[in-house]
Amino acid sequence: MDAPHSKAALDSINELPENILLELFTHVPARQLLLNCRLVCSLWRDLIDLMTLWKRKCLREGFITKDWDQPVADWKIFYFLRSLHRNLLRNPCAEEDMFAWQIDFNGGDRWKVESLPGAHGTDFPDPKVKKYFVTSYEMCLKSQLVDLVAEGYWEELLDTFRPDIVVKDWFAARADCGCTYQLKVQLASADYFVLASFEPPPVTIQQWNNATWTEVSYTFSDYPRGVRYILFQHGGRDTQYWAGWYGPRVTNSSIVVSPKMTRNQASSEAQPGQKHGQEEAAQSPYRAVVQIF
């Protein structure tokens, strides 16, 4: 004769405490949560819509640490942006010669790839970077056009949440030759109308400099709605008009789409046991999120 059970078996997984269900959901891939689990019942839908779940998933997948103290406007959007987080520029460190770059101007002896530190140069701050692009005695410019939708950033995300777009570039001169470096970054609409731009004045470095690598960084925030493309262009020329490759050296360029870190009214985190759904109904991103899968 079987021993009597001390507690009756659960008739349904929904009888589990909501905290336990939330913990289970942190182990489920986001694709299944949105396309399958969220459709099972209203309880699952409301739990999956909780900011608390997506914060836990961020912690579990290493997007944040336990001591994270920065405010986040929307943990769901934060999660998906971190999932997509990468450098949108291809071949930024010249490892594949000129692959992926559009040559806009190829003056003098043209663009060339060299290995660090190069003649009369210095080591790059990051030892993982091994090569750089170098310009000549007439203008050399190269560019890439990034298609944000093709890279997985859906239109509703770009227009409603407008995540930060962080642009970085590194440049240096040879110690024995002066040069001029320039950078232009433009945010453009679907029909290539420029909506925002960053184009600082050209930087001129004098001859007999210390050849130090310099980082340029700029963040596009609260830009106009409608951004679909990013144009990145950089280059320059030497100032001595010497044959060969004595112009500015560039490498380790990057464009990264990052979550905003400012809390707003959409950032409330309802806890298990509270009423769900109301705080997220106004701007639920799920209809558009599934497009990334």
UniProtKB/Swiss-Prot annotation:
InterPro entries from the UniProt entry: F-box-assoc_dom, F-box-like_dom_sf, F-box_dom, F-box_only, Galactose-bd-like_sf
Pathway membership, UniProt: Protein modification; protein ubiquitination
Domain of life: Eukaryota
Cellular location(s): Cytoplasm
Biased composition (Polar residues): 261-271
Limits of the FBA domain: 78-259
Gene3D superfamilies: 1.20.1280.50, Galactose-binding domain-like
GO terms for MF: carbohydrate binding; ubiquitin protein ligase activity
Keywords in alphabetical order: Cytoplasm, DNA damage, DNA repair, Phosphoprotein, Ubl conjugation pathway, Unfolded protein response
Transmembrane region(s): none
The protein's assembly and partners: Interacts with VCP. Part of a SCF (SKP1-cullin-F-box) protein ligase complex. Interacts with CHEK1 and CUL1.
Name listed for the protein in its UniProt record: F-box only protein 6
Biological source species: Homo sapiens
